[in-house]
Each structure stands twice: as structure tokens, then as C-alpha cells.
Amino acid sequence: MKMNKWTVGLAAAGVVSLASTAQAEENSVLTAMSSTVISGSVEASYNGSLGSGNQLAGHDNGFAANGASLAISSPLAGGDYSAAFNVELLLGQRAADFSGEGDDFHIKNANIGLNLPFGNGVDLTVGLFDTIVGYEVEASGSNPNVNRSYGYDLEPFTHTGLLASMSLSDGIDVSVGLANAFDSTAGLHNDDTTDFAYLAGVSITVPDSLGFLAGSTAFVGYTVGAGDDEDKLFYVGGSIASPIENVSLGVAYDDREYGNGDEADAVALYAVWGVSDGVSLGLRYDTLDGTDGDSTSMWTATLGYSIWENVLTRLELNNESGDRVNGSSNGLGLNLFYQF
């Protein structure tokens, strides 16, 4: 154990014991490490088609090593003025797809969390963090389906800045933030200006008193750059409990206004049925009104099942119509997502 000169001097004078000091420092390190969580995922897949060419996967039919993620974090502890951190890395094709730059390594998150004992408590996030809008996320295993919806590609992915989140009352949470750009993800949606972007969102959770709707959530979010030439995105989404056992519903709407005056909007409808223990069926229908004035639609059916521990295996069918460039297309995919 390395000690500073001040500690060594105190030990020589008999004020402290080197052994006890070393033990105290070791215990401090162990205490810090005990709250650190290491997690991540590894993804692999097979992409094919039924008859026509598969334009949905973005590459030729065949096997794919989608890549991996690795996260090291420490959650906010209870009590006032607590602190936390979060670092998340993407590797392989997942890094290339997310960053838009083709690199096999990408820093997705690098932020510090801070708690302020103000009102009901304010949680601050400083650094590089995920966007507050959107129904789907980068990790496919956390989504109802493997392939992303049209709306996902309209949204910003990450922001570098400051985000403040707090609960106004039971079931009502708000978030406001200031960031460097509409999207801080390298190679995607960056306007390359020094103007700030502003983030705002409100989440409402249905109380238990409303019967089968209890636990349903609705979120409204808005992200805008601080200039007339900046992009804007308005998002409304919700997860809805249904009266049918083991069936949940979802909806998402994205309206993207580009700095050059173009506009695109997307709507997605979701239904997930927990067929049995370890088996689920996820359905999605989504549409896109693109910047070129064309309308494109897609339906997706995803059968998920858990055979191996920590592995989500999913078989997915996609069918797209209305794409002027590629025409109608269908996809057949098998995806394995290991999470630790």
C-alpha cells in the first residue's frame, strides 16, 4: 500500500500505525468497489429474407456479429449530496451503427450523477448521457422488437451537457437540460455549431386507483437547438396496461423538423403478449412520412423465448412497403442477445 510522506511521518512519531492505516485505505477502496456495477451484453444474429431481397438489415444476408456493450457504473446512494458515475462503451458493429462513423469503438455514456436535497430531491447528470426522448433504445434486448422503428432514427441519441430530473408529486416527474447540440452522437445529426440545445420532458404514471390502467405511463418530450437553423424533435409516447392478462400496449409519435426546413414524422404501435414463462410475442406497426413526401410502412412480428440462462433468443419477421428506393422488402432474422 503506497502512503504519503505525511502518513509515514505520523507513523514514525508513533501517532498512527502503518498497518492500521493500510487496512483503513484498503477498506475504503473495497467500500467504493462494492457499489460498482459491471454489466453489458453481446449480440449475434442471422439475417435473411422470404423470397425477395432483404433491404432491412443494411447488409447482405448471412450471419453477423452485431457487437457488444460494456458498462461500469455506481448508482446514486441514499441520502443527501450523494454521487454516482456511469460509463458505457459500444464495440463492433453496434458502435459503428450508433455513431454513424463506422468505428468499432464508441463511448456511448460518460457522466457523473449528483443529488441535491432540494424539494423532493433533484438528480443531476453531467457529461455524456442518453437522450430523454424515445420509446426504443440502443440495446435491442431491451426493446419489444429487434429491428428499430422509423421513429428511432428520427430521434437524437445522446447529449453532452447537464440534465436535471425531479419528482413534482406521486406519478409526475420532470426533466430539463442544456446540451451542446441537438445530438452529441458523433457523425449523427450534429449541426456543428456552438449553440446550445434545450431538453424538456414530463412523465406521468397512472395511479393504482385506476384499475387495470395502473402503472401505465405517458411521456412528452421536446429537444431543440438554440438557433433558427437547428433541428427540433417533439415526442409523445406511452406504455399502456391492458385488461387482457399478460398483454401490454405501446404507442410512440415523433415529429422531426430539420434545420433546412424539411420535416418527417413517424408513428409506431406496439403490442406485447407474454405467452408463457420465457415466451413472448411482440408486434409492431409503424409508419414514416419522410422528408421526400413519401409514406413508408412496416409491420414486425417477434417471437422471443428463453432457453439458455441470460440469453434472449428471438425470431423476427418484417415486411416493408412504400420505399421508393428499395421497393417492398421483407426480412427474416434470428437474434441472440446475451446480457450480464
Task: Describe each region flagged by the PLM.
Residues 1-24:
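Gram-negative bacterial Sec-dependent N-terminal signal peptides
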Residues 6, 103-106, 194, 229-231, ...:
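Short glycine/proline-enriched turn or capping motifs at secondary-structure junctions
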Residues 25-184, 192-199, 203-210, 267-270, ...:
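Outer membrane beta-barrel
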Residues 99, 185-193, 225-227, 259-262, ...:
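Solvent-exposed loop segments that connect transmembrane elements
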Residues 198-292, 297-298:
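Detector for outer-membrane/organellar transmembrane beta-barrel domains
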Residues 204, 305-307, 328-340:
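Outer-membrane beta-barrel "beta-signal"
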Residues 258, 288-290, 308-310, 320-322:
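Short Gly/Pro-enriched loop/turn and capping motifs at secondary-structure junctions
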Residues 300-317:
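C-terminal closing repeat unit and adjoining cap/tail of repeat-based domains
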